[in-house]
């Protein structure tokens, strides 16, 4: 008997750094292809998919502003443009394997992509298209995690998935500490007050206020995204 898929609409957040793969900068085509195939498996199972990608593989606003020459506001806008570059790359990868995809930007770039309109985004999803949201919230001082949470709420997602390099949430960095303990479930409050890095406090608070579950999972395990949505144990952690 086939497992029943519980969530019909999800938003998946990928970090820009993940797109760089083993490189320090840019886009690893192999990683891009892997992500595209994982997204395709969701679409083939009648799941409506929204995507947000960070821009850290190109530039981070906070880092750009550290030298004192570039103001933080300008640095953040530069970061927003980086997310649009990643969004267009992901669109190409998805369309290459046959998925109808739209990019919507919080900053108007009409020659490249649509401007973000939540009603239009929902209509695209209902038609089976993948929608990639670029340029963050369109405002400086907000992270792409916050942008992803905001878009997830606006389009009515059942949950937001933060796809990372680890299997879930740990009490400390599993890449540095062999005794790191995986936390399968924790509350919004625990995520806010603890030293556990899930998302920034603004994103978690927004999810809490709107009762949006946050899932953290490993993006590099083949089939893992689909398994997460089926609520199989052992492949993710959840904040709710």
From Swiss-Prot:
Domain of life: Bacteria
GO CC list: cytosol
Binding site for ATP: 13-16, 56, 60, 164, 170, 173
Pathway terms, separated by semicolons: Pyrimidine metabolism; CTP biosynthesis via de novo pathway; UDP from UMP (UMPK route): step 1/1
EC id: 2.7.4.22
Residues that, per the record, bind UMP: 55, 76, 137-144
Protein activity control: Inhibited by UTP.
SUPFAM superfamilies, A to Z: Carbamate kinase-like
GO biological process per UniProt: 'de novo' CTP biosynthetic process; UDP biosynthetic process
Assigned keywords, A-Z: ATP-binding, Cytoplasm, Kinase, Nucleotide-binding, Pyrimidine biosynthesis, Transferase
Reaction equation(s) it catalyzes: UMP + ATP = UDP + ADP
Annotated Pfam families: AA_kinase
Similarity comment: Belongs to the UMP kinase family.
HAMAP family: PyrH_B
Task of the protein: Catalyzes the reversible phosphorylation of UMP to UDP.
Subunit architecture: Homohexamer.
Name of this chain's protein: Uridylate kinase
Biological classification of the source: Bacteria, Pseudomonadati, Campylobacterota, Epsilonproteobacteria, Campylobacterales
